[in-house]
Structures are given as C-alpha cells and as structure tokens.
A protein has these predicted regions:
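Phosphate/diphosphate ligand-binding glycine-rich loop within oxidoreductases
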Residues: 8, 71-118
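N-terminal glycine-/charge-rich "phosphate-binding" loop or analogous flexible N-terminal tail
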Residues: 1-70
Length: 118
C-alpha cells in the first residue's frame, strides 16, 4: 500500500490541497497523513544555506522526522530539502501546489529518481 502525506502549512491553499487530495487518495484506497507545520520563518528554515531551497514555511527537521515511510509527498510552502529527501527512502513523487518550487530541492530529487510536479 502506498502512503501519501499532505503537508498542512497553515495556509488556505494547503488546507484546500489537503481536502481535495485526501478525498482522492482515500477513493484510491491509499493511506493519507497530515503533518501540521510551524508556519513561522526563522533563520534555520527561511534561508537557503546551500540546502537547494529558499522561500518556504516550516521546519525541515519536523518534516524529516515524519517521511521515512512516505511514497508521495504533497506540499504548498513546506520545505522539501535534501535532508527531507534523504530521510524518505520510499519517496517517488513530490507535488507542489505552487507555480514554481523554490521550496523543493529539485536537483536532489532528480538524483534520487523522484519526480517533481508543480
């Protein structure tokens, strides 16, 4: 069974993403999980510092602690850095609700054979 995680980052867009995707995921018989993120920007999560990402909300360490068994990751503003990708050995697909992905380390995802959609 595939596991889908929809990350809630405190925004209306992520709430709607959760509602729409959770309904679709459940119709397919998949397990869905919501992770609530701290929406505050702080010096650790708001700056790139070579992590391959910028402009995001939430703590990298918080999400990394919950992705080990996730196959599909759906985000809006939540960070998807190399730390998160490396903590998710089953991850095969990342989808973003945004029109660009400054919050996703696309190069790292490619290196790990993970598709990214936005």
């Amino acid at each position: 069974m595939k596991k889908v995680m929809v990350v809630y980052d405190g925004t209306e867009a992520s709430r709607l993403l959760y509602e729409r995707m959770t309904a679709q995921v459940r119709q397919q018989g998949l397990e869905a999980q919501v992770v609530c993120h701290d929406i505050k920007r702080d010096s650790e999560s708001g700056l790139s510092r070579g992590s391959g990402i910028s402009e995001f909300r939430g703590r990298i360490d918080d999400l990394a602690a919950h992705v080990a068994d996730v196959d599909l990751l759906l985000v809006h503003l939540a960070p998807v850095s190399h730390e998160i990708i490396e903590a998710a050995p089953r991850l095969r697909f990342i989808a973003s609700e945004r029109s660009s992905v400054p919050n996703i380390d696309v190069a790292c995802a490619k290196e790990h054979g993970i598709a990214v959609s936005y």
